[in-house]
Amino acid sequence: MDDKVETGNIDVRLLELLVCPLTKGPLEYDAERSELVSRKARLAYPVRGGIPIMLPSEARSLTE
């Protein structure tokens, strides 16, 4: 069984361990935008080359 999420090649086991660096809350993977989303912080962290960039300065603010 393949433990990779199709888009972005994110390891599912890694996603289960990662939390938002600001809130320590859970993250959701948005495959369409290749981002990890923290609903609590209202931020989306980019995933580049399969590597999550967990820096608040690199995150996109969610204005929705």
UniProtKB/Swiss-Prot annotation:
Q: Which domain of life is it from?
A: Bacteria
Q: Which residues form a coiled coil?
A: none
Write down any Gene Ontology CC term.
Answer: cytosol
Database matches in InterPro entries: Trm112-like (IPR005651)
Known Pfam families for this protein? Trm112p
Q: Which family does it belong to?
A: Belongs to the UPF0434 family.
PANTHER family this protein is in?
PROTEIN PREY, MITOCHONDRIAL, ZGC:162634
In Swiss-Prot or TrEMBL terms, this protein is called UPF0434 protein BCAN_B0909
What species is this protein from? Brucella canis (strain ATCC 23365 / NCTC 10854 / RM-666)
